[in-house]
Every structure is written in structure tokens, then in C-alpha cells.
Amino acid sequence: MLSMSSMDPWPEGSVGLEEEVVTAAAQAERLDTSTPLQCNTSLDSDNLDDSLTSLQWLQEFSILNASTGQHTSPSSHSHLMGSDAPSSPLAGDPASIGMPLTPGKPTAASFCRVPMFSALPSLVAHGHCPDEVDYKSNPHIKPPYSYATLICMAMQASKKTKITLSCIYKWITDNFCYFRHADPTWQNSIRHNLSLNKCFIKVPRQKDEPGKGGFWKIDPQYAERLLNGAYKKRRLPPVQINPALQHRLRMNAQATGVISRNLSVSPESQQLLKDFEEATSADQNWDPRLAEATMLSCWISGKGTNKRKQPYNHRTGKTPRRSSSPLLVMDEQEDLSSLRGNFDWDALLDSALNGELSLNEGSPLSPTPQDEELMIRGTHISPQEAPVENHVLMETQRSGDEDFDEETFLATAFLQSPWSEVDESNRSDFLGSSTVSIDQLFDLSFGGDLSSKIETLL
């Protein structure tokens, strides 16, 4: 059970806390009124930076003002204005904006860090923008301009069409204090820019002009761009493409994508597939491997002889070529209609071996060729007048050779009848005579008058 006596120490503790806070505030005031020399001495003795661990910033809260009722002295405000550092860590924190803070006083750590920040020769330490920097009097800040821009500024300030290298050096050192105190290697960079940059042109000195060295001027072609700062980093402007050309390229790219997605089939391939399906549906007993090989050979021969079909159209007596492929043309299918159907080849072969099947009986398997007109060296020959030549011509044409010519025909006809028969009564055959014996023939091998011996034999 809790008693009221257990709650009595709480107010007493709160009073003791207020006394400690007041004591700390009094000590802080004594530190503020002390001289900076004492602060530096204490820092040298301690040689520690307590800006992160010090709790002296607690005195800046309003609770201290409510308890003590004291106000800051004008001297503290002068120290704050002279130092660009915040009075406390919370005063410089953006997250503390809007908090009820009193005009603070700099802490010991922040008060002693002011000389270190003010000694840094940088824009951040001084809190100035580049436009507010006086480059003529500030030797610590380098001008934010490229060497090409500095050369162009010197040429524009001279009010002359051409300027010497020494004048460029003089103008840069007069207007920018940084280059007066910097290492003189920047002059080499100026010379390299004049020699390598295409914006500057070297003008030779005339003979009657006094002085030494040549002159330099800005190329009129690049003068406007250089003055506008386009060549500050030597970057060319982006290439402008005609809108019409952009639209055309975009349309071509879309068309290419559509073509790549859709497979195109030529009409020849479609017709070949259609013929193949018709032939396979008409004949059910065809060999797929044979059909595939035949299709390939027909395709190759069709592409190879496409240019040679035209010159032979005027020739007569041409017989269509027979093919073992199921891909038959319509006229061939009509001529060979009697061969359609399923045949028992084993039974046919057995009948032929037994003599039961006669190939001479019945209708012929192939259609009878019609009488055709023959032209040899411009002379008309009817089939009745030249039966042998007509037979040779038909056999030669059935062999499938489309390159048949007259020389082949004449040679074949000559072999059929190389010479005409001579009447045997007008010519004596010595070797073929049956009256001469073998002994008489051997007698001819011995010496003597051969002519007399032959006459006796005859």
C-alpha cells in the first residue's frame, strides 16, 4: 500500500534540480564574461573538443530565462554577429526551426572555433556566392572560367581585331589576382589553347609592324558560340535532325518489326504445296523418301533450267518427260489413267515367269505417238519416206534430252545404214570364198611370186 510519504521526495528532488540548473547557468555567465585568451588557454590545457559531449547548450532554453530572469548582454550579440557560427547545435539545425528559442549566446566550443573557420580561403567558409567575389583582389579563389573563355574575354576587352600573347597574359593578371600569385604554369595552358583550339586563328606579323611574335584573333565562324559559352568545355551542340527524317526512320523501323514478326510465303511455295497434297491424295502407295528426293530434284532442276526453257519452245515433236514422282502434271495423269490403282506386283511377276502373261497382248501401256512432221536441213520428210529416221528421232526424244540437234540425228541415221550393199556378182570375195583351203593360205607365207600364187587361187 502506497503512502503519502513516498511521494514527498519528488518535490524535493525537483527543487534540487532547479538549484543545479541555476548553478550551471551562473557558471556559464562567468565563462561568457571571461576573455578569449582564457578560453584559448583552457583549450590548450585540455586539448579536447567537447562540442559533441558538452551540455552547455541546455542554458539556451526558455526554462533558464524563466528561472533566472536574466538577459544576455550586448557584448554577446556582438560576438554572435562577428562569428558566422550558430550559437548552439540546435540553432544551426534545420529541424529546430519553429522551436521557442531565445537569442542565444555562443558556447565555449563554438566561440573558440570561429578563428579556424575564418582562416579557410574558400567560398563555403566565407559564405559568399561566386558572383559576390572580387577576383581582382582575392588571391585565394580561382575564377570559374576556362582558359578559352579567359582568352576570349581578353580579346573582347582589347577592342582590337588581333592581340598578342603578352597582352593576353597582362589582361588576365590585371583582372584576376589569383593568376598573379599562382604558379606560372597556367601560361602554358593559355598557349596550348591558342594552338589547339579551332576557335582561335594565328595572324602573322607584317614586316612593317614593330615588335616580335604573331597575333591571335577569334575565328568569325565560332565567335558567337564562344562568346555565349558554348565552348567552355569544348562540347559541340547536339545535332538537330529534320522532323520529316525522324518520322520516316520511325516508320521504317515499325515496318521492319512487322515483317520480322510475320512470315512471308511466296506464291510458288504455296502452289508447290498444293500440287504435293493433290498428288499424295491421289496415290496412297507412294514412298515418302522417294517423293522428298524427287521434290528436291525438281526444285533444283526448275531453278537451273528456268532460263533455258524459252529457246526450245519452237521445236516440234517434243515428248513430255516421264517422272516416277507422285507429283504428276495433269496431262500426264490423263495419259496414264490406265496405270492408276493398286497392283499386285508379286502376282504379275509370277505370271511373267510362268509364261502366263503376254506383254504383246492388250492395249499398250503408253499412248501411241502421233505422226509428226520432220524437218532436216530445210527439207520436209514424211514418216512414210523415212521410217528409220523417224524411229531414231522418236527414240532419241523419248530419252528426255531437250538439247537434241540435227548432228545427233544424222550420226544416228548413219550408224543404222553406214553404206549401201554392193552386188556380189560384180565383186570377188577372196577371204570369204569356200574354195580356198587352209593349206593354200599357208603357202602364201613362203617366198615366191605372190601375185602368181594369188592368180592360181582365184
From Swiss-Prot:
Where in the body, by tissue, does this protein show up?
Expressed in floor plate, dorsal forerunner cells, Kupffers vesicle, the floor plate, pronephric ducts and kidney.
> What's a single GO CC term here?
extracellular region
Chief place of localization? nucleus
Q: Which GO terms describe its biological process?
A: cerebrospinal fluid circulation; cilium assembly; determination of left/right symmetry; epithelial cilium movement involved in extracellular fluid movement; heart jogging; heart looping; Kupffer's vesicle development; regulation of cilium beat frequency involved in ciliary motility
Which stretches hold the DNA-binding feature? 142-236
Q: Show the InterPro entries listed in the entry.
A: FH_FOXJ1 (IPR047512), Fork_head_dom (IPR001766), FOXJ1 (IPR047513), TF_fork_head_CS_1 (IPR018122), TF_fork_head_CS_2 (IPR030456), WH-like_DNA-bd_sf (IPR036388), WH_DNA-bd_sf (IPR036390)
- Deletion phenotype: Randomization of the left-right body.
Q: Which GO terms describe its molecular function?
A: DNA-binding transcription factor activity, RNA polymerase II-specific; RNA polymerase II cis-regulatory region sequence-specific DNA binding; sequence-specific DNA binding
Q: Where is the composition biased (Basic residues)?
A: 305-321
Does the UniProt entry include the keyword Transcription regulation? yes
**Induction behaviour:** By hedgehog signaling in the floor plate. In response to injury and stretch.
Disordered: annotated segments: 68-99, 305-324
Localization recorded for this chain is: Nucleus
Feature: compositional bias, Polar residues: 68-78
Give the record's keywords alphabetically: Activator, Cilium biogenesis/degradation, DNA-binding, Nucleus, Transcription, Transcription regulation
Q: Which family does it belong to?
A: Belongs to the FOXJ1 family.
Q: What does this protein do?
A: Key transcription factor required for motile ciliogenesis. Activates genes essential for motile cilia formation and function. Its activity is sufficient for ectopic development of cilia that resemble motile cilia.
Name recorded for this polypeptide: Forkhead box protein J1-A
